[in-house]
């Protein structure tokens, strides 16, 4: 059920108290004996809330210390590129991360302009560096972000030398060792206090960090002079902006110069959009680009939460209203790994835009015919188009980490997630980023408009006229731990029925089509659609996804039958 405030402007009384949240980050010590307070990597890093003891100073210190301990196992021998988004907790977490890197004599490359650094910019920096790096100077990266989560949340993720999200083997190793540090406490961490360095090395520090006067930091066996040598300034922004013609037809955009509204959504890439508009002299109107960790300009999401989800029509409601005479609007989440595309018809669903992007890229890039990577919950239209145009589909579990090696070695031209995350290859067929990039997906929509004269929404209509018009829904369902456990351990044989939503079942899978990796749930395919259920990694709920070619009524039947199937699992497994 949609919350009555969904789509309405956020009220002042619902905004976070930044000072309180930051104090909780340093003040609260997580209890390693409480499962919820231990380090736990989901599909993209460790996330939590300071007041609940799930994202605090010790979590960040323990994770970064572990990264320093084991990064050479993953091939990282050189600098660590570090970025952060605009969540309130990202600033103190960045401070802690830098201090631990310095204490371990790992070169920390931070933004030269004291600006925020988006996820795709970190990924691009790692790949740019490693393209010419010697064996003893291979880079990796750390990104401080809880993505589109509400303002009180914090998060941290690790990108190894391939530039994308760490795979499960890497995160499990980090998780296990970090929890050992969590048990030992801050005294076990090698760390150089940022206070000593700010005055001596002002030119390179991030400028965004919070400083606690009474903060206790275990001394590191490193001098002030030596620590200064391990903190390096790097111009993330302009390196990224100047390389855009390698992946986007910026000349076509310049020539057409359509009027585009950019909703920076208070995120880490606001300065990037300004730099792009200036560098290429584009007709962009940029809003919500100021730093506001309360995200006071937002509208409530579907459940009444403040969530910076650029793919949500409720969170993007105010932007849709402001489209005016702009042909297109683009939105991004706080760390800029997601995209939202708005036309006069409204906000395009990610599944709609991603199939449009796949078709357009295949028709315009020299590397056309490359495979398309999609998660198990991306629209079946993608399969229909790819099968008709004779290029392979790589269907993987949910999580962009599964696309990183496929993009890195060029097996796929596009990697696409239903949650509005994607990246694609450069014009010459080489890798751009191995993490999601919301900026290039936004610019691609502008390029489409410039070269075809059609908006992505109009191009989607062209696609559905050939392969049908599916309807899609995703719902988060509260559940017991028993249902989550049963769902994660589900086998295809647990589904005994022959129909779902009134249509014959063609296939039941608990592994992906590509490499048969566990999807931590189940996918049921019928002759008129599909249903997926998978448990949340951090909350007592499971996610239901369904797509039907039988309209809204068919979708409702599919969802209801799927829900009954999942909730019957506990009885089946007892």
Predicted features, each with a name:
Residues 2-103, 128, 205-208, 214, ...:
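An N-terminal, well-structured beta->alpha segment
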Residues 2-12, 75-164, 383-384:
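Ferredoxin-reductase
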Residues 12-15, 20, 24-27, 106-124, ...:
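Phosphate-binding chemistry for phosphorylated carbohydrates and sugar-nucleotides
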Residues 33-43, 193, 216-219, 286-293, ...:
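Flexible hinge/switch segments at interdomain interfaces of large molecular machines
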Residues 83, 141-147, 331-334, 415, ...:
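Short beta-strand segments
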Residues 130-202, 209, 216:
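Internal gly/pro-rich beta-alpha loop/helix module
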Residues 454-574:
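Catalytic-core signal marking the mid-to-C-terminal active-site face
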């Amino acid at each position: 059920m949609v919350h009555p405030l969904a789509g309405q402007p956020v009220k002042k009384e619902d905004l976070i108290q930044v000072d309180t949240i930051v104090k909780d980050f340093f003040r609260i010590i997580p209890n390693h004996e409480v499962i919820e307070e231990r380090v736990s990597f989901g599909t993209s890093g460790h996330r939590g809330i300071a007041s609940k003891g799930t994202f605090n100073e010790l979590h960040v210190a323990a994770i970064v210390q572990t990264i320093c301990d084991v990064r050479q196992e993953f091939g990282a021998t050189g600098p660590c590129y570090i970025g952060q988004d605009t969540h309130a907790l990202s600033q103190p977490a960045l401070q802690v991360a830098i201090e631990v890197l310095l204490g371990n004599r790992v070169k920390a490359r931070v933004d030269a302009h004291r600006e925020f650094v988006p996820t795709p910019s970190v990924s691009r920096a790692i790949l740019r560096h490693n393209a010419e790096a010697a064996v003893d100077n291979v880079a990796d990266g750390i990104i401080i972000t809880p993505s589109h989560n509400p303002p009180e949340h914090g998060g941290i993720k690790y990108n190894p030398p391939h530039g994308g999200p760490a795979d499960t083997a890497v995160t499990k190793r980090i998780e296990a060792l970090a929890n050992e540090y969590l048990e030992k406490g801050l005294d076990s961490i090698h760390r150089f206090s940022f206070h000593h360095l700010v005055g001596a090395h002002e030119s390179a520090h991030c400028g965004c960090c919070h400083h606690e006067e009474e903060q206790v930091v275990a001394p590191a066996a490193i001098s002030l002079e030596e620590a200064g040598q391990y903190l390096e300034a790097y111009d993330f922004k302009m390196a990224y902006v100047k390389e855009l013609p390698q992946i986007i037809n910026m000349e076509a955009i310049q020539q057409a110069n359509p009027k585009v509204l950019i909703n920076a959504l208070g995120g880490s890439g606001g300065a990037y959009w300004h730099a792009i508009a200036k560098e290429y002299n584009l007709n962009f109107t940029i809003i919500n680009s100021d730093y506001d960790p309360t995200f006071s300009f937002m509208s409530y999401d579907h459940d009444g939460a403040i969530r910076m989800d650029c793919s949500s029509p409720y969170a993007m409601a105010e932007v849709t209203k402001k489209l005016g005479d702009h042909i297109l609007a683009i939105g991004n989440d706080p760390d800029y790994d997601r995209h939202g595309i708005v036309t006069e018809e409204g906000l395009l669903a990610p599944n709609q835009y991603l199939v449009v992007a796949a078709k357009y890229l295949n028709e315009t890039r020299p590397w056309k015919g490359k495979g398309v990577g999609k998660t198990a919950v991306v629209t079946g239209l993608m399969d229909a188009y790819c099968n008709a145009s004779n290029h392979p589909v790589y269907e993987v579990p949910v999580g962009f980490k599964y696309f990183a090696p496929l993009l890195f070695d060029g097996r796929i031209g596009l990697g696409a997630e239903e949650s509005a995350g994607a990246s694609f290859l450069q014009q010459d067929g080489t890798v751009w980023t191995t993490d999601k990039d919301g900026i290039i997906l936004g610019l691609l929509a502008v390029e489409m408009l410039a070269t075809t004269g059609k908006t992505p929404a109009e191009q989607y209509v062209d696609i559905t006229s050939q392969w049908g018009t599916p309807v899609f829904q995703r719902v988060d369902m509260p559940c017991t731990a028993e249902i989550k456990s049963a769902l994660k351990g589900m086998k295809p044989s647990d589904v005994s029925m022959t129909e779902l939503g009134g249509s014959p079942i063609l296939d039941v899978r608990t592994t992906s089509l590509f490499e048969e990796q566990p999807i931590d749930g189940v996918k049921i395919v019928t002759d008129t659609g599909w249903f997926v259920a998978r448990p949340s990694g951090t909350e007592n709920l499971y996610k239901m996804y369904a797509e039907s070619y039988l309209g809204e009524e068919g979708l409702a039947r599919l969802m209801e039958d799927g829900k009954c199937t999942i909730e019957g699992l506990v009885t089946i497994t007892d």
